[in-house]
């Protein structure tokens, strides 16, 4: 009887933990998702692209306020009217709070990045969104 009870309890614990892991993985970490799209002045200039990548990677690596970080280029997805893929780079950062995102805006690493790289882009578009429960 003890063995059956232990097995049943173990199964219950494993099942509960799996459900919790599954629920956690459904949603992005962070209250605020900060999505930034960059259009470079000279996207075909390898030297300028390398300079931009060096600056933005330094920003991402030295930023201690973001929970999750992503740097990417347009995906090679199906061309459709609703798909915007004219940008050169996308950076996504998630923050635990509005305060953390505000601190990031004024952080020396962010300001240094802007100063070092602003001459390399012709357009920047930012989309900030607050996480909703799903």
Cite the ranges covered by each PLM segment.
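Sec-dependent N-terminal signal peptides
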Residues: 5-13
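Short S/T/G/P-rich N-terminal loop/turn motif that feeds into the first structured element of a domain
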Residues: 18-92, 96-102, 130-134
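Stable alpha-helical elements in mature extracytoplasmic
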Residues: 48-55, 109, 113, 117
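Structured helix-beta-strand junction loops
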Residues: 62, 120-123
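Short, exposed beta-strand-loop hairpins at the edges of beta-sheets
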Residues: 102-105, 115-117, 121
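A short linear boundary/processing microfeature
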Residues: 107-110, 119-120, 132
């Amino acid at each position: 009887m003890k063995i059956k009870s232990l097995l049943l309890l173990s199964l219950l614990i494993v099942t509960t933990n799996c459900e919790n892991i599954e629920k956690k993985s459904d949603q992005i970490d962070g209250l605020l998702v900060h999505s930034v799209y960059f259009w470079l002045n000279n996207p075909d200039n390898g030297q300028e692209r390398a300079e931009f990548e060096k600056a933005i990677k330094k920003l991402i690596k030295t930023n201690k306020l973001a929970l999750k970080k992503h740097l990417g280029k347009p995906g090679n997805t199906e061309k459709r009217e609703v798909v915007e893929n004219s940008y050169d780079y996308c950076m996504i950062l998630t923050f635990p709070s509005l305060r953390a995102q505000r601190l990031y805006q004024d952080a020396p690493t962010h300001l240094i990045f802007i100063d070092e790289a602003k001459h390399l882009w012709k357009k920047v578009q930012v989309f900030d969104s607050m996480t909703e429960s799903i």
